[in-house]
């Protein structure tokens, strides 16, 4: 069963039921998640201690093979990192990407309150890390300079992905 992600993040009482933040100081899984995020372009030039502090606010979810993570049209609430497993991203039944450990997706939701543009399904047992927009906004309030750097990194990532999509469309015309 897949719960509505939008409900989980807009109602704090519901968030406690459906989402758990399992990280604690010194947790080795937190260190792994921190390193995986640091290996992405989103956290380029963000100091490790600040990345780790932000990662400590993130949420873990386990999915079974075949379980829907989100569907096209669902309200986006944040980006998702594949900690372990595999995720298929598709739109109109066409595969857009097959993601593995360390890959991230759904980052549009960090920048805009838009609906998901694709479907995401676990193709194997998967552990995912949710980086919610509301957590990013709180972090930016406390760390505005680093927040500006992060938003520049996010903008560059979105621009690169848009460019790649445009190139793919141009080849098909």
Regions found by a protein language model. Name each.
Residues 1-173:
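Cytosolic regulatory regions built on CNB/CRP/Popeye-like sensor folds
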